Amino acid sequence: MNKIYILFLCLCYAVSAIMANTYKNDKEVTIPTDANIFGHVVDKATGEHLPGITIILKGTTIGSVTDDSGHYMLKNLPEGEFTIEVSFVGFKTVTKKVTTGKGKTQELNFELEEDLISLEGVVVSANRNETKRRLAPTLVKVLSPTVFEKTNSTTLAQGLVFQPGVRVENDCQNCGYSQVRINGMEGKYTQILIDSRPIFSALAGVYGLEQIPANMIERVEVIRGGGSALFGSSAIAGTINIITKEPIRNSGSFGHTISNLDGSGAYDNNTTLNLSWVSSDNKMGAYIYGQNRYRSAWDSNGDGFSELPKLKNQTIGFNGFYKTSAYSKLNIEYHHMEEYRRGGSGMKLPPHIAEDPELNGTGEAGLVEQLQHSINTGSLKFNLFTPNQKHNLSFYASGQHIHRDSYYSAYGRTTDFTGVMGAQYIYSFDKCLFMPADLTGGIEFCHDDLDDRATEKQKYREAALAEDPTATGQHLQELIEKYTPASLHQIINVWSAYAQNEWKNDKWSFLIGGRVDKNSIMDKAVFRNTASSKSAEHIAPRFSFYSIS
């Protein structure tokens, strides 16, 4: 633990030096330079102008999108040599070098070529830094919004089934519990992240795959296997990283879908609302989304027990950004979700009555599970770059609070708070020993506070009186406590530190890294080591090795 604290202090010292240098340069770029770039983006095959294409000045927070006519303009750019990157889903990413100068306006046009297998898409799960998918040292599969739209998937769980090597199982027809399997391994061996942060707790994972609406997802990155040291010891079978949508241009949409389940009287209704706003100078923006879903219970064989539970789900959230300078950016995200799910028998009766053979009107014991969730999730991230494009620093904090009221043979209440905070630093070497390289290091602290207790009173009182009908006072209280399940209050703190160096060029990539996690309920720290490589340009065999001890 002392080593982690020392590492944290060293990182803070290094950060302060970098920030001082960055802010010194920022003062220079706040003065208008009148250095502008304009142009258009067209489809290489058809010559058609393409709207909504993303244009960014790499190494800065400056960017724009093409308008409805396929044109763009970047104004008051910092002086120097930069790389402009143009990208869009379904097209190969194109980059061009450009030198900007004070009072200089220049035209720069782009042609985009269709990318049928999305090898040029940018991913972050391979090494916690933006990397083209074909250059990533580990194989990253990507689920784009197009997949969700074409398959009419309204939730994460529905979309994941279209990813090879990934299987979503519905393991309980009573409550609808689902888990994701990668390479055949159980769900507990898969690390689920939201914007690269491990705030998807064990409690959230029980029903969470169905609780994340598709309209908040920009893409889902899936890594099969544990070929990265930058994620925790839970990433054994693989990692699923849910990247949320950010505002790109001013737009809005409204949609409603209705699906019938196997020609029965059960329907799944889903209503979505999306609004995106970006200021005229592209310095701030917000993406607001909402979903309302209602699915009636489905009884496939008419035996009185549901195969799919009844669902009522409402989600609302936003994702916003503010560019504090040309080299720094603040992101904030929040969403709130309410869900009611009820499965089993006696759908129109209260759970405890539907389960009692003397009260439910059937003379047979029922089987019932009912859950009500209230979930709040938020995150804050601050990114900082330097003008020479060698330093990339980020601070982040994320949290998720879950309140769940449940019934399964008895009423209960569960609350869970998961919080994550940390810092990450990336340094780009022009040459490290034999090749350009990116060195990544960081620290992370994760806190989880789980409280689970029974709220049933009458049921345990009746059980106590059945044992001793004459019991009163203290004796009755002792008997009630005897039958009441013990409450659980568990607090877990995990300190983590990781480092990784990746040598890469257009044809070769070598990576070595390690991570240490100190869990408060374990005596020894968990060490994770990994190595991977990728070679060749058109055929890219990859090798990965990792160990956990």
Residue ranges with predicted function:
Residues T22-V29, D34, H40-E48, I53-K58, ...:
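Short, acidic, small-residue-rich periplasmic hinge/interaction motif at the N-terminus
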Residues T60-H71:
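Short, acidic Ser/Thr/Gly-rich low-complexity loop/linker segments typical of extracellular
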Residues M73-N76, Q179-R181, R197-R224, K245:
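Short acidic/polar hinge/loop motifs at secondary-structure boundaries
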Residues A157-P198, E218:
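Extracytoplasmic beta-strand/coil segments of soluble accessory domains associated
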Residues S201-L203, M216-E218, A229-N241, K245-N301, ...:
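Outer-membrane beta-barrel translocator/receptor signature
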Residues I258-D262, S279-D281, N292-S296, H336-Y340, ...:
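Transmembrane beta-strands of outer-membrane beta-barrel pores
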Residues R295-T315, F321-L393, G399-T418:
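Flexible loop and strand-edge segments within Gram-negative outer membrane beta-barrel domains
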Residues S325, F434-T440, E444-D448, I480-S549:
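Structural signature of Gram-negative outer-membrane beta-barrels, strongest in the C-terminal barrel
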